[in-house]
């Protein structure tokens, strides 16, 4: 395990002013189970959208064609936090309050629970696939990065060396290496899949609170800083650059995604209503700021459907939302 500090060049930039703020269309559907905190949607290979109800212990699927919802009950008290859907249609979810990763077979409704091998790993948080048959995941309060072999069900846990770092958002780069942010540690981290050696990189301002992470086509790491109101980038050579979000320190950026044109989509959860922001990662400028019609309340995670060129997210206003990616960036 290695912590890297003082080895990077830090460049802090002011937020570039957009030429003209345009808006994109945000479509929302009311989830039929009130106050269930729908969150963390994921688009399955068949185009249907799965998500969890964190407060009501369910997984559900939405068909954008028929606009129908279907609910699957999860173990009582599981507190599902996140899910992802494999090519075979099996749904893998994080049992955040019961220290397990679950596997739901939608054809039968049967659920398999894979327990964490260490009692300290009590709260699996966010899951992501790699291309080698694994699921990588964060364990926020337990302070681990985990790897689950989907075939054998073996779980490897790597303890984060920074105490109480609260590893949060996680993504896997094209080379199969997972990258994650430490919400309370003020760092970006990565794990070598071969050796399970963990490396950390300090953010320019350790008081920051990075929530989510995205990786662009150049391999640069992007993140949103919830407390400082910034979007930041760590390049492949270890240099940092940050920009203020449109609402500044009160922006509270949370959910983050990236499209296949390296445009960053994130949600400012500080303003009421919440606001969806599109930021051009190549030109380093804000392209669009759009209020979320339902108000949002908070938007914690989003997913990009490259096949259909759309982002999906869920809101604390009990809605499921879709944003279609513009063919050309607004005001380009």
List where the protein language model places each region.
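A short beta-strand motif characteristic of beta-propeller blades
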Residues: 27-31, 68-73, 110-116, 154-160, ...
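Short loop/turn segments that connect beta-strands within beta-propeller blades
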Residues: 63-67, 105-109, 149-153, 192-196, ...
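Blade-level signature of beta-propeller repeat domains, shared across WD40, Kelch, NHL, RCC1
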Residues: 297-332
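Conserved beta-strand positions in repeat-built beta-propeller and related beta-rich domains
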Residues: 50-55, 91-99, 135-141, 178-184, ...
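Beta-strand-rich domains and repeat architectures in extracellular enzymes and scaffolds
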Residues: 30-58
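Beta-rich, blade/repeat-based domains predominating
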Residues: 34-45, 76-88, 119-132, 162-175, ...
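A short loop-to-beta-strand structural motif that recurs across blades of beta-propeller domains
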Residues: 58-61, 99-103, 143-147, 187-190, ...
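Loop/turn-rich, solvent-exposed surfaces of beta-rich toroidal or solenoidal domains
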Residues: 250-278
